[in-house]
């Protein structure tokens, strides 16, 4: 007859339990705001440059701000244009992240920007389009 000796199994114990619920102030710290800038609208571009062959560059220089911890959804659009590309730049050199940048429709470019720092920042937005 054989005798088997079983030692206790080593089961890891984690003192921290996973809590899938977010803290109550999560939505307060992570805000989302949307803006729409049109090439021929209420907030006109600060500069427009004819690039030739029907291509134009539009710039909204330091006209918008992004707040601390905010996700800013920027809609750059116009009538009778075909968007080619869009972009942004902050006035300072602190981190600022593009979460997404894409053409939503033929005449609309969308940029989603996140400001992880705790200061309000001025940004410039750019759009290249063909008329």
Swiss-Prot record:
Protein origin, superkingdom: Bacteria
UniProt name for this protein: Uncharacterized protein YjdH
Originating organism: Bacillus subtilis (strain 168)
Lineage per the UniProt record: Bacteria, Bacillati, Bacillota, Bacilli, Bacillales
